[in-house]
UniProtKB/Swiss-Prot annotation:
Transmembrane segments: none
Residues engaged in binding GTP: A268, C269, G270, K271, T272, N273, R384, R415, F516, G517, Q518, N519
GO molecular function: GTP binding; manganese ion binding; phosphoenolpyruvate carboxykinase (GTP) activity
Short name of one Pfam family: PEPCK_GTP
EC number(s) given by UniProt: 4.1.1.32
Organism lineage string: Bacteria, Pseudomonadati, Pseudomonadota, Gammaproteobacteria, Moraxellales
Pathway assigned in UniProt: Carbohydrate biosynthesis; gluconeogenesis
Organism the protein comes from: Acinetobacter baylyi (strain ATCC 33305 / BD413 / ADP1)
Protein's UniProt name: Phosphoenolpyruvate carboxykinase [GTP]
Subcellular location(s) of the protein: Cytoplasm
UniProt-annotated catalytic positions: C269
Broad class of where this protein is predominantly found: cytoplasm
Gene that this polypeptide is encoded by: pckG
Length: 609
């Protein structure tokens, strides 16, 4: 039996007993209690360089930065192997994979038996959210992957201080992770151990996470999607708050008025770019600051406003397409201390990916560690960077405020070639929830599967809601009602809800809207709507701006182009709204009646387009 040897700074008997129990099951060669120190980080990096898991990059150009190349079979989240094992199947709902908890436990007990043989088990303590915040949650991840241990140090508040908050009897979310590649004595390890069989399992009632077979980010960094969205959304439903797949940004106008906006886009629809937006020419005196680029935890305040924190401490961003033109703030964030995964590397040890520069450098080594072949992808489409959020030049002064920041508006948007206009404002909270619930987006490389097919991705939470999606819609409706009453009493208002689509195409298939920094023009109109000073036209699908309602200083974007991306087609909208029935039927009896009623009203309204 492996010695647990808990250090003095761990004073939590229940935690120590749990580590003992998991060690008994997984049988690691040794146990290491992570303290989050610089020394520990460097030691684990050096260990991975020696093992061939990582390589040091050019330290002049990329100080403190390293590259890991994963196994080609382990490159993205595996939605078909992700389970919500609630006690009752109907509590997981039709959009989640479900297995009876006792069946799954029996299966996992068999798989985890001896799964860490020959490896070190790392005990990784982490806080999602600022340490000690009333919105934060503590997790402990037991993993046999040093890649996970070093990545968690960037993505969460990881280290000794977590145990001070935890004390002797604090609550924590238990997370168990294995790459599922036990080593027999004397057996040589591979650079990226993983297993063709994969399970990412959540038990919402007992707040446990078990992950088997994958070393990749979203499947292995269990504080991220697993805790911060799937488990946290189930907690939020019980406790009256929201865990959302949203960026949070602050907008300050030249008058000094500041608003915080939370926005939900599916993966690879530009969340990180939008969160770090740089205002374009014509917007001197405006400022955009970043609170978070991926996840928001939102709790109602006593004043009836909704307050959000970014539970993460780092960015785990998609590298391809990122460059000094599309996201200068992000590129500046990557100036040092980055862990890259599945990008290409130049012969002098610099990183490269599609979209970083027009010219492909000569003698590239691709993400599989082989010489790059022209016409093939040098970096994997889902290649990532992992970096501390504090390095971002646009980071908001309040990004770690334990009380959170007050949200003025929610934005929902997907990747649609037609139908959905550039921007529209919902008529009211119920209408906004309907629009978010029926969001559609063309599929991308961030999930394994087909590309270019429109799938419904409610609230951009389809892969991340930890309970029945119909109950999730109901939770949004109920929360709106409760918070709305509180807000009214305090003289405040519920956040406005907007829909955007940066991705409309013309007849030749080209994007019409320039996007990136130009999205500031849409953001300004939204802020002015919140402040009650911008015009809008009422249409069957919401309030929309005219060409004259937007600020075009510094650009020659024409009225014809604007009309092209804001036009509403009666036939397209009838097809669109009728297609929502498929999702609603899938959700069955638990679907809130208010949404079905809203669908009927919309169907009648769009006949008038």
């Amino acid at each position: 039996m492996t010695q647990v040897n808990a250090p003095e700074f761990v004073r939590h008997p229940k935690l120590i007993a749990w580590v003992e129990e998991i060690a008994k099951l997984t049988k690691p060669a040794k146990i290491e209690w992570c303290d989050g120190s610089d020394e520990e980080y460097q030691r684990l990096i050096d260990l991975m360089i020696a093992n061939g898991t990582m390589q040091a990059l050019n330290q002049e150009k990329h100080p403190g930065s390293y590259l890991a190349n994963s196994d080609p079979s382990d490159v993205a989240r595996v939605e078909d192997r992700t389970f919500i094992c609630s006690e009752k199947q109907e509590d997981a709902g039709a959009t989640n994979n479900w297995e009876a908890p006792e069946v799954m436990r029996a299966k996992l007990n068999g798989l985890f038996d001896g799964c860490m043989q020959g490896r070190t088990m790392y005990v990784v303590p982490f806080s999602m959210g600022p340490l000690g915040s009333h919105i934060a949650q503590i997790g402990i991840e037991l993993t046999d992957s040093p890649y996970v241990a070093v990545s968690m140090r960037k993505m969460a508040r990881m280290g000794k201080a977590v145990y001070d908050v935890l004390g002797t009897d604090g609550e924590f979310v238990p997370c168990v992770h294995t790459v599922a590649a036990p080593l027999a004595e004397g057996q040589k390890d591979v650079a990226w151990p993983c297993n063709p069989e994969k399970y990412i399992v959540h038990y919402p009632e007992t707040r446990e996470i078990w992950s088997y077979g994958s070393g990749y980010g979203g499947n292995a960094l269990l504080g991220k999607k697993c805790l911060a969205l799937r488990i946290a959304s189930a907690m939020g439903r019980e406790q009256g708050w929201l865990a959302e797949h949203m960026l949070i940004l602050g907008v300050t106008n030249p008058k000094g008025e500041k608003h915080y906006i939370a926005a939900a886009f599916p993966s690879a629809c530009g969340k990180t770019n939008f969160a770090m937006l740089i205002p374009p020419a014509g917007y001197e005196g405006w400022k955009i600051e970043t609170v978070g680029d991926d996840i928001a935890w939102i709790k109602p305040g006593e004043d009836g406003r909704l307050y959000a924190i970014n539970p993460e401490a780092g960015f785990f961003g998609v590298a391809p397409g990122t460059n000094t033109k599309t996201n200068p703030n992000c590129m500046a964030t990557l100036h040092k201390d980055v862990i890259y995964t599945n990008v290409a590397v130049t012969e002098d040890g610099q990183v490269w990916w599609e979209g970083l520069s027009k010219e492909v450098p000569a003698n590239l080594t691709n993400w599989k560690g082989q010489p790059h072949v022209a016409g093939e992808k040098a970096a994997h489409p889902n290649a990532r960077f992992t970096v501390a959020a504090g390095q971002c030049p646009s980071i908001d002064a309040d990004w770690e405020n334990p009380a959170g920041v007050p949200i003025s508006a929610f934005i929902f948007g997907g990747r649609r070639a037609d139908t959905v206009p550039l921007v529209s404002e919902a008529f009211d909270w119920v209408d906004g929830v309907y629009k978010a619930a029926t969001m559609g987006s063309e599929t991308t490389a961030a999930a394994v599967g087909q590309q270019g097919i429109v799938r419904r991705d409610p609230f951009a939470m389809l892969p991340f809601a930890g309970y029945n999606m119909a109950d999730y819609f109901d939770h949004w409706l109920q929360l709106g009602q409760q918070v709305g009453e509180k807000a009214e009493a305090a003289g405040n208002k519920l956040p406005k809800i907007f829909n955007v689509n940066w991705f409309r195409r013309d007849a030749e298939g080209n994007f019409v809207w320039p996007g990136f920094g130009q999205n500031m023009r849409v953001l300004e109109w939204m802020i002015d709507r919140v402040e009650g000073r911008a015009n809008a036209v009422e249409t069957p699908i919401g309030y929309v701006p005219t060409y004259e309602d937007l600020n075009w200083t510094g650009t020659d974007f024409s009225k014809e182009e604007f009309d092209l991306i804001t036009s509403q087609s009666k036939d397209q909208w009838i097809t669109e709204i009728e297609s929502h029935t498929e999702l609603f039927n899938k959700l069955g009896e638990r679907l809130p009646k208010a949404l079905k009623e809203r669908q009927d009203q919309l169907l009648q309204a769009v006949q008038k387009i």
